[in-house]
Amino acid sequence: MEDLFDKDITILNKYVDKEHRTKYKVSYIKGFWSSNNGISINGTQLIKNDELIAKILINDTRNEKYQKIEDFRKNQKTWTLQNGDYLIKGIVNDFKTIANLREQYDEIMKITNISIKDYGAKELQHFTITGAWYEIYGWI
């Protein structure tokens, strides 16, 4: 199963430090990444139909252990998933700011939905993450 979840993904988790400054914790995981750039035709209308989906195995031993959101807010030990955070396809070694990141990487997802699929066989349990796509022209 891990063969399908072979993409390097960088997670940027937003948090507020003790001085009330916004910070990002950078983490790296393995997962599945799917991106579609497309349109649909609805009668006489063309509708932009872009999609970014990432899936992360819950019990993947290659990744650090997932941290629940409430635990992450207290102590940023590993990684979590929350709306408004970012996933980037690939390894980001030189993160400074979100604006800088947008200039250097093509496939960036701002998380809009997290679904926990924790039923069935343990090796199939996963998080499904969807989000907004950023391109050269702005958020879609």
PLM ranges: what are they?
Residues 1-22, 26-29:
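N-terminal intrinsically disordered, low-complexity, charge/repeat-rich segments that act as generic
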Residues 23-140:
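Short, conserved turn/kink motifs that form compact alpha/beta structural patches or helix kinks used as
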